[in-house]
Amino acid sequence: MAHKKGASSSRNGRDSAAQRLGVKRFGGQVVKAGEILVRQRGTHFHPGVNVGRGGDDTLFATSAGTVEFGARRGRRVVNILPVDA
């Protein structure tokens, strides 16, 4: 057994908080304008119809409607289908 703790053990012992990334509103859910749909790093999902992209690649609804996930040109996209008034 070592009688010293080791060279770096006193410099360890920290961890970063999780970033809470991922899909926040799933397909078929009704959303209002401005609601966050996906939090991501990079464009894992691309913005589609009625969806905007923030500076940190967050996707958000630009109008009220129903969330739809799909594909366009081999990319995963998120669309908002408008609510029939």
From Swiss-Prot:
GO terms, biological process: translation
NCBIfam families, A to Z: L27
PANTHER family in the record: LARGE RIBOSOMAL SUBUNIT PROTEIN BL27M, RIBOSOMAL PROTEIN L27
The keyword Glycoprotein appears for this protein: no
One annotated GO molecular function: structural constituent of ribosome
Family, similarity comment: Belongs to the bacterial ribosomal protein bL27 family.
Keyword annotations from UniProtKB, A to Z: Ribonucleoprotein, Ribosomal protein
Any one annotated GO CC term: cytosolic large ribosomal subunit
Name of the protein this chain belongs to: Large ribosomal subunit protein bL27
Pfam families with a match to the protein in the record: Ribosomal_L27
Domain of life: Bacteria
PROSITE patterns the record matches: RIBOSOMAL_L27 (PS00831)
Organism per entry: Mycobacteroides abscessus (strain ATCC 19977 / DSM 44196 / CCUG 20993 / CIP 104536 / JCM 13569 / NCTC 13031 / TMC 1543 / L948)
